[in-house]
Amino acid sequence: NLPNRPETLGEQFVVDAAGDFVRREERMLLLSAQLTLEELVTQVNALGGMAIPAHIDRPENGLIPLLGFVPPGLPVAALEISPNIAASVARAKFHLPDHLAVVRGSDAHWLDAIGSAVTELELEGTRSVANVARALREKRYAIQN
């Protein structure tokens, strides 16, 4: 539990459901976990979640630059790319598995960047992890910029 250094790492705020400031987080939240990628994904899945590696193409901390490939058999529903690359280019350049959906998010680190890149899903039924996973598996999604 190292203390955060706001002067070099930036502030870490805790907000409530309405987005209102609650407090500053004093502990540094940038430290890595002592899990392998496979262990992490397995735990997320076991808890009913859905692991989607984020901005896999980004030079800093992206899955492809860090590992050089997507591990075969990694039980994820999708791979997320940054707004800097087209899905078709990412698929070809990084030899992404055909069975995995490639989605895009805004990778927002600032409030005004939220929604700058969007993947729309065609869901059947209620909003749930299972229905999102099914839509991704059945390729019922579209990347919007």
Residue locations for each model-derived region?
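Charged catalytic cores and adjacent phosphate/nucleic-acid-binding surfaces used
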Residues: 1-4, 11-12, 17, 28-29, ...
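Internal active-site segments that recognize and position negatively charged phosphoryl groups
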Residues: 34-44
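Divalent metal-binding segments
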Residues: 21-33
